[in-house]
Amino acid sequence: MSAVLTAEQALKLVGEMFVYHMPFNRALGMELERYEKEFAQLAFKNQPMMVGNWAQSILHGGVIASALDVAAGLVCVGSTLTRHETISEDELRQRLSRMGTIDLRVDYLRPGRGERFTATSSLLRAGNKVAVARVELHNEEQLYIASATATYMVG
């Protein structure tokens, strides 16, 4: 029998799993700065392996999309798994294993120039089966780099 988690503990565990336990996300160096049921903010620093255009030294579009996807996933999954006051860790992990991205629509608004990037997401809607989030990516100068709408299977 697994531990019973409060909604707050469940949200903390989801954040740790998404950002610090997934090898790809760790490789990107993501840091979770703020995480609530319907809002998430994560940041990462530009690294040589993230450059998609070496002549301009800008982020690869896949890195941008990945950061947006993770930020959106946090609010879609977190809001779903914390609807009740408590959840067992086993149930959380089992339900999480069935959740995933259905669609991610990215608008690349500016070249990904900068040293540090911040992705912020907010929940638009959470149903029993599907959740939708809106995400933005800014650099350290607060230039708007990209936005996305993400749809997740959550039930």
Curated annotation (Swiss-Prot):
GO terms assigned for molecular function: acyl-CoA hydrolase activity
GN (gene name): yigI
Protein's recorded name: Medium/long-chain acyl-CoA thioesterase YigI
EC number: 3.1.2.20
SUPFAM superfamilies: Thioesterase/thiol ester dehydrase-isomerase
Family statement: Belongs to the YigI thioesterase family.
Protein localization: Cytoplasm
Species annotation: Escherichia coli (strain K12)
Listed Pfam families: 4HBT (PF03061)
NCBIfam families to which the protein is assigned, alphabetical: PRK11688.1 (NF008675), unchar_dom_1 (TIGR00369)
